[in-house]
């Protein structure tokens, strides 16, 4: 199982990691240690299916509050 995080792109173009639903709290954090999600890609995609629709994961989001899924490896390597 890969490590996945739920993240959104804010208006400044920075990633904001969200553990609101998976962590059981309502906080958001830019600290990746607080936002790690141990979920399979399939389960994470199903969870956010209504919000994501059929859109591909992209940084070109119009709404900064729309979440997307990135892997921890991508975040750490800054390849997104």
Residue ranges and their predicted role:
Residues 1-31:
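Short aromatic-glycine-(Arg/Gly/Cys) micro-motifs in beta-strand/loop hairpins
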Residues 36-80:
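Short, mixed-charge low-complexity intrinsically disordered segments
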């Amino acid at each position: 199982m890969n490590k996945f995080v739920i993240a959104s792109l804010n208006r400044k173009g920075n990633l904001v990691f969200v553990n609101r639903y998976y962590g059981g709290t309502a906080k958001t954090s830019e600290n990746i240690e607080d936002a790690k999600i141990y979920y399979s890609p399939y389960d994470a995609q199903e969870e956010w299916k209504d919000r994501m629709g059929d859109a591909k994961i992209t940084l070109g989001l119009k709404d900064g509050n729309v979440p997307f899924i990135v892997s921890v490896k991508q975040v750490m390597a800054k390849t997104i």
